[in-house]
Amino acid sequence: MLSLDEDYQAWEEYPQHRWVFNKLEVALKLGYKAGPACVPLPKTSNTLFKAIIRPIYNLYGMGISAKVKTFRPMIDNEFIINHGYISPGHFWCEYFEGTHYSIDYKRTDQPKGSLWAWEPFCTMVGEKEENNLTKFTKWVSVNPPKWNLPRFISEIDNVEFLNIECIDDKIFEIHLRTGNDVLHGKPVGSKAIPIWDDEQYNIKILEEQGYTFKGNHHPDSFKYNAHGLLSDLRIGYMIK
């Protein structure tokens, strides 16, 4: 089997599961309030609706083109149905607040559809600012949350690993590969602090605190700027 590091590889390897890359379809399967560009937002009792806007498909990852916005549906819907605020190829979804988990799962020998079909083996909690969804400041290895995956995820078969991202128990991304490799094999409590191109001064500071630098999976850092779509360039992590 191909060693999968990227979503585009998983797209080619698992054509039967390509629905997982459709983030709008995942949101609707999970019962979230969501819709593509041009679909009006639900009208709420408090007149405001906080949403995250993202590309329906983004096989590059890194939160490209994602942003949070609070709408006034009674006023803004007239613009939204004419492509105001939300560009073609994007969708809106209700915004969830809470702990950001990234969980790597491996397939067990339990049958397809079993509650125990997938076993978590590396869980990280990430920290970031709401006004910059691509620039994380810290990842910490933690024990996995105690919850059951939705049945439609348990029924994914012929795949070796999954990476699931969620806010508390609200899943928002599914990857047919691992995602937490930077802390694989590390004990609970281990930390990975991203080092960004404009913050390289932190390397020496963190080395004095016992951290060790680990470069990106791909040594060519330009591969992490999405051909200019990302303004923040990650060059690696400090691990402790």
Go through the PLM ranges and name each one.
Residues 1-5:
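N-terminal non-globular leader segments, chiefly Sec-dependent signal peptides
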Residues 6-152:
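Active-site nucleotide/adenylate-binding loops and adjacent lid/helix of ATP-dependent enzymes
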Residues 62, 110-113, 124-132, 138-240:
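ATP-dependent carboxylate activation and anion-phosphoryl transfer catalytic cores
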